[in-house]
Each structure stands twice: as C-alpha cells, then as structure tokens.
C-alpha cells in the first residue's frame, strides 16, 4: 500500500513556509497555538457572515427577476473572496495578522478592518498586545487551490454536474501561470448510493520532487446526499 503524505508538510522548509512566526516558552506554547486558531476562525467567520449579508441585500434590493438571476450567476465569482492563508507574526507588544485573499471587496469597505479588530480583541482578550491587520491581494487568484475548491463547491450546491464543475475549474486555471493541476472529487457523486472518486489531471505533477512548488488543499462540501471531498494539487514551478 502506498503511503500518502501531505504535499505541503512534505515541502515545509524548502518551497513552503510556516504561517505562524513567533517564539514561546514550552509551558506557553499550547496557549499560543490556541490563540492562533481563534484568530483564524474569527476572521473566516467574519468573512462568511458579511458575505451572506451582502448577498441577501442584493437579492432584496433588486425587484425585477432578470436582475436577480443575473446576480445569482455573478455569485460564482464570490469564490475569489476566499482567504488563501492567514499569516500571524507575534512580537512582545504587537500581533501582526496578514490576510491573503483573492478579491478583498468586503474588507475594503469603510470600517471593516476596525470592526474585525474589535471582534478579534474580544475573542483573544489581548490586553498587553495590540492588533495590526493588513490585507494582501492575491495576484493570481485562480492559481490558489482554496479558491478553485470554493468555486467547485458553489457549482455543486447549485446542482451543477460534478464533471462540468471540474472542467470549469480546470478552465479557470488557464488564466494562471501554472505547469500542472489535478482535481479529485470523492463521495456520493450525482446522488449515487455507492461512493466513488473521479479525477481530472492536466500537465505535470511531480509529487515526489521536493524542490517542486506544489500547492494543495482538501475541502469538504456538504450536499443533500452527504459530504463530498475535494482535493486539488497545483504545480506552480520548480526551484
């Protein structure tokens, strides 16, 4: 049996880097990890909550059915607002949080960063440390596996065929400068009683080469037939 390893952890220190940068005493290390998880969960919940509010406002404000259907079609682009990664850098008196996101439309609104900072302060109860949040826009959104996985999830929840959703995601990668991509979906595909896996691959994908920069994500999708698992590998470049 072949033993599968996470492509990101396999390349940690060569082509991949840590998302948290800080030092702590051994007795305080677990508290630092829990604080990082609270920060990341709070930011993701804030994005999801505000995205739902903005989509509901659009549907309520548009009276004609033509405009409503047009907005629903455009919601497929909301997958680009997915957070690709959150980097946390801790100093003695400051916590720097860098949010990497596709198109930061929600966080660019007036007062959004201040509101997010207040939520984080309540969550982590940091009295002696101040928060510094910055937004980094991803240059090539469709080179990020998290964004492609969210796009596939949106298509499947709208009852689009899984094969069609996979092909559309592969087409989006043509806009990005990559050398290979692999998309795999497993579960009760199409509502079938027996679970199976479908896979599409394009280009090169040297998983055994450590110097190859490969981005990877595993994303669960909850449907009426159960949970589907989406895995995406993207071969960016070779160092």
From Swiss-Prot:
One of its GO terms (cellular component) is cytosolic small ribosomal subunit. PROSITE patterns: RIBOSOMAL_S3 (PS00548). Keywords: Chloroplast, Plastid, Ribonucleoprotein, Ribosomal protein, RNA-binding, rRNA-binding. GO terms for biological process: translation. The keyword Cytoplasm does not apply. Its main location: plastid. SUPFAM superfamilies: Prokaryotic type KH domain (KH-domain type II) (SSF54814), Ribosomal protein S3 C-terminal domain (SSF54821). GO terms for molecular function: rRNA binding; structural constituent of ribosome. It holds the Pfam family Ribosomal_S3_C. Residues 43-139 form the KH type-2 domain. Residues 50-80 are annotated as: Disordered. It is found in: Plastid, Chloroplast. It comes from the Eukaryota. CDD domains: KH-II_30S_S3. NCBIfam families: rpsC_bact (TIGR01009). Belongs to the universal ribosomal protein uS3 family. Part of the 30S ribosomal subunit. This is Small ribosomal subunit protein uS3c. The lineage of its organism: Eukaryota, Viridiplantae, Streptophyta, Embryophyta, Tracheophyta. The gene is rps3.
